[in-house]
Regions:
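Short, Lys/Arg-enriched N-terminal segments with co-localized hydrophobic residues
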Residues: 2-13
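N-terminal interaction modules that seed assembly of large macromolecular complexes
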Residues: 15-79
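N-terminal intrinsically disordered, cationic/polar leader segments
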Residues: 46, 112-116, 122-123, 131, ...
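A structural signal for well-ordered alpha-helices, especially hydrophobic packing surfaces
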Residues: 49, 77, 96-103, 124-131, ...
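Aromatic-anchored, charged helix-turn/loop surface patch used as a conserved interaction hotspot
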Residues: 63-103
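Amphipathic alpha-helical repeat scaffolds of TPR domains
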Residues: 70-74, 117-122
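Residues within HEAT/ARM-like alpha-solenoid scaffolds
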Residues: 87-94, 107-118, 135, 139
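Eukaryote-biased recognition of C-terminal alpha-helical segments
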Residues: 135-173
Length: 173
């Protein structure tokens, strides 16, 4: 048993390499070994597998991917249990987790703005009491602020395109 405890401390104390160190090491790895490492990483965690799937198969057509995420969000918004705010809040947070996961995969400010704008629009149109229930209202406000902050980093032409929908959402405030 003491042997296992020693092994556990060795693994628990393992420090991760920096991104720069990993980048340098990967540049020296032969392609066959690199494929093996990627496949092993994909088997290790579901999120790694999903990210690799996005990068290999979906990243070429980003707009189609964004549209598919919006459709997934729309489907989940259709399942929101509006009979009790507690259940609605749980489903809304689940939708937000999914949206944020896809935003991380895409890694684009424009995609983040578009997905958060869609989320805020669907939440506002859901008919849930955003004013009287502070939890839902705060959730909406925080996502709106995050979206607006990201919108400010986009090119002026893109900002103009998104401002029409943003002005509709501002009516809630």
């Amino acid at each position: 048993m003491a042997y296992l405890t020693g092994i556990w401390h060795t693994f628990a104390g393992m420090k991760s390499a920096t991104v720069n160190e990993i980048k340098q090491e990967l540049s020296s790895v032969p392609p066959a070994r690199l494929v093996h490492l990627c496949l092993r990483m994909a088997k290790f965690k579901k999120e790694n597998k999903e990210l690799l799937t996005y990068l290999l198969f979906e990243a070429q057509d980003e707009q189609a991917y964004i549209d598919s995420v919006k459709q997934e969000m729309d489907g989940l918004f259709g399942e929101v249990n509006t009979s009790h705010v507690y259940f609605a809040k749980k489903t809304i947070r689940k939708i937000l987790r999914i949206a944020n996961k896809h935003i991380r995969y895409i890694g684009s400010a424009q995609a983040e703005t578009e997905l958060l704008l869609h989320f805020c629009g669907r939440l506002k149109d859901s008919g849930l009491p955003l004013h009287s229930k502070t939890v839902l209202g705060n959730l909406y406000q925080n996502q709106w602020k995050k979206m607006y902050k990201t919108l400010q980093t986009l090119h002026e032409d893109l900002q103009y395109d998104y401002m029409k929908e943003v002005s509709r959402l501002e009516e809630l405030e």
